[in-house]
Amino acid sequence: AVARACNMTPSAVSKLISRLEKRLGVRLLNRSTRQFQLTSEGCQFYEQGIQILNGLDELEQSVTANHIPKGRIRIHTSFSYWTHFLLPCISLFNQRYQEIELEAHLSDEVINLVEQRIDVAIRTGPLKSSNLVARSLGSTYKQYVCSPLYIEKYGCPEHPDELHEHQLLDVSYQRQNKTWLFKKATQEVSLTPSKVLKVNHGEAILQLALAGAGIAQLNEFQIRNALQQKQLVKILEDWNIHASEEFHAVWIGHDKYVPNRVRTFLDFLVEHASIN
């Protein structure tokens, strides 16, 4: 992929990297017959190099005559955020910033921004990586829901312990079953589901819930219309834990040295694609 992007042969790229490693006196890549993986020194070199290049890009943009942001932005986001927030305003962005080319990669998994060469990623929950800069896009609440059809067939649980007898829906990219949390006044219940149908993104879980396939834990913005149209109903409302889930746009580098095209995209997200 690197060779194609640079219009070079793989062997030529490999030789350049080997020369760089020799000059630095450290190994930047771990090599195998099928893939390359960055070492910790390689990650550090890449991340600091990105900061330097971003600073040069910002300098170049600041001295050009028109200051028009341009170039490609590789973004990574979940299907849910793309569907409910980015997709409705992407045409406006393309119309407003015609010199910027967006390349979107959609999945609900947390990926390595360095390895996947991602400029901006949308992430939910606590931020674990200290080398990422973040900008808040707001927060939402999760609700436990199912369809009236499901209740008609299997009944409605009135206590979290009864969920062991029900079909639950959850994401599949976690190795272990996620703990579901419930709170009622001073009582707290944690449940690790045993009977779970798993799929790999939140919008598929929504569709399964609408089809009566089980009980799901979904973001409020995903189910708003379905609740209004009575396609879904909330369950265990007295037990729902009202903890918010934060959304952030994250990138590698320093907040001071962000390429003009990336800063433009971040500003657009805050204005048009924040969680309300």
Describe each model-derived feature in a short phrase:
Residues 23-24, 45-67:
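Alpha-helical linker/hinge and terminal dimerization helices associated
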Residues 70-133:
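Central regulatory/effector-binding core of bacterial HTH transcription factors
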